[in-house]
Amino acid sequence: MTDIDTPASPLTPNSKAHLEVIAYNQYLQAKEQIQQLEHELTEFQESSKELELELEQELAESDKRQAKLEDRISALESEVTEWRKKALDAHKEAASTQQALQREVSSLRDAHKLVKERLRETENANDDIEQRERITCSTLEDIQTRYNEALENVAILEAELAAKDVLIGEHHRAKEEIKDLTEELEHTRKKLAIRDQELEDANKRIMNPPPATNHNATTHRRAVSGTAQVSAEGYLTPLTSTGAKPLSSSRSMQFIHGLQSQMRSLESRVAHVKSSLPKPTTPKRAKSSASAVSGASTIKSSPSMALLTRKLSEADDVVSLSPSRSTSSLEDLCTPSPSPQVARRDMSGGGSRLDLRADPRLNGRPKTQQPRPSYNSALATAKPLDPIEGSPTSLEGRNRTRSASPTKKLSSLSLNAPSLPQSQARVNIPALMRPASPIKQPSPPKPAPGSKFADVYGRRR
């Protein structure tokens, strides 16, 4: 709109014209605004139509999309319903499965606890069984040890019984021999007393001759020449049957003194033999195998019959009075039968048990019962002994005696250690008990039984 030209007249502010002008100006402004608003409205209507069309198109499209979405929603809802059902079913199934598994786990736990308890009980029972087994093994070993000790004690006692029987026989023989030796000693004493009396009578007759003439003295000398001759020292000198052969007085006195010393030695030895005879004792049951073995060794190392036989044989050689009782017969009578030798094992290793591996009782074989040695069997198996060493006269006989077994053999023993040699097991005679060595001279002949006493050269008085 164009502006309207107004006259240039001064107007007052409160004048009518001025107000009309103002109102007219406002009218013009309002009209312009209305036109502008109409134009804007038209534009707005056009744009709104376009917008409405677009919106309608969008609405149709959105309706289509909504329908599609609703269809999809319905499909999804159906799917959700199905999945819900499936989830519920799966949940129910999982719950049932979980309950079943829980029940199974609880049952397995109970079974595991039961198995643990059974295993614990089994282990305890196994420990008890092992302990019983150990106790049984130790008891069995103890019983076996006691059984072996009992077998050893039985074997040792059997050996002691056999040795006791042999010693009893030897004791009886020794008593008889001592009795015979006592009789021979008394016989020798009587002989020595008679000889001393004859010597004293002869000395008295020589020292105190009766008064006689020369003729009587010559006759007396001729009579005495056939019987005896007086020496310078005043001792009687025996003569032979052919002529008078004087004997040195020192030799005759030495013989007499030697005989006296031998008699004294014989008496002392007989007394020693009587005191050293073993007394028969009943063997007691050994407390242990070591004491039993030591007892057996004590029996073996005690004064044996070999020592007694040696003493008696030496006494028989010294006296030599009765030819009827010769040395061989005395040795045959006094020779002991071989006693069982129970040897011990080597103690250096600490072992004191006998070796019983060959025992038939351990191997299940019956033991053969054999008779005990008797006095007659001991006499029957006697062997002559050496009068000096108390052993068989020959080396072969000594070996045979060492290896000979007793009448009652201990077949249940198999001894590993060798027995002591006979020379070591024999007790040595003290030097004082040995007879005095006589002067080397020809031994006088033994008198015949029942004959009178004879002098040094065998002449009867």
From Swiss-Prot:
Keyword check for Nucleotidyltransferase: no
Positions with biased composition (Polar residues): 366-379, 391-409
Chain segments carrying region Disordered: 266-300, 316-461
Record note on quaternary structure: Self-associates. Interacts with PAC1.
Family: Belongs to the nudE family.
GO biological process: centrosome localization; chromosome segregation; establishment of chromosome localization; establishment of mitotic spindle orientation; microtubule nucleation; vesicle transport along microtubule
Keywords from the named record: Coiled coil, Cytoplasm, Cytoskeleton, Microtubule, Transport
Organism: Yarrowia lipolytica (strain CLIB 122 / E 150) (Yeast)
Molecular function GO terms recorded: microtubule binding
GO CC term (a single one): cytoplasm
Its job: Required for nuclear migration.
Gene3D superfamilies named among the record's database cross-references: 6.10.250.1080
Biased composition (Low complexity): 288-297, 320-329, 410-424
Location in or out of the cell: Cytoplasm, Cytoskeleton
Coiled coil: 21-206
Name listed for the protein in its UniProt record: Nuclear distribution protein nudE homolog 1
